[in-house]
Amino acid sequence: MSGVRLNKYIASSGLCSRRKADELIEQGVVAVNGKVVKELGYLVQTKDKVFVNKKLIHPAKHLYYKFYKPAGYITTCEDEKGRKTIYDILPESLNNLKPVGRLDKDSTGLLILTNDGDLINELTHPSVKVPKIYIVTVNSAVHRKDLEQMANGVEIEPNKIAYADIQVLEIDNKHTEMQITLYQGMNRQIRKMFEYFGYEVKVLKRVQHATIRLDGLKRGDVKPLKPA
């Protein structure tokens, strides 16, 4: 019998990744034509109606955008503290898209936005070493031994070792500008690594995520991407 696997159908709606869809199915919150389905291999047919938490879902056309996040905005849909979010400046038509990863409030640069749950999972799962490239400026000259230690690993939190590939672009007594490549996804990783050695990050801009580059965008700009 032909059809689409239930987890793929749910993921194609933009609700979540296939992995998360499997969890929802196992939790018993997914129903097809009014009946709860817990079979992970269930095949959805053309005329079937699928509900998650009693809400009807539909497969959505996958959309992909790149966005130049300005400083001062957090990467979330809503904020309990009332801070500005990226959705305050994105076009309302893109409010259903989710960011691939995050940038903290004071950081700028590239965010990929999509409703493709599988892609989000693929690019953010800890087991996948996807390169993310940043231009970073700190408040003084960084010692060579500190750069070497960052390359070898720094324990920024208990049992959490952070690594970074660092290329120095400019250095003097008052600042160091670097290109930094990360393959991990730890919260505020770059800032914590430099704080560990007593440096203050003054500028942090992401310029590349996987193969997508920031090129051609000004702060606040958003541009559609063509699917691969």
Q: Over which residues does each language-model region extend?
A:
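Basic, flexible Lys/Arg- and Gly-enriched helix-loop patches that mediate nucleic-acid binding at interfaces
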Residues: 1-228
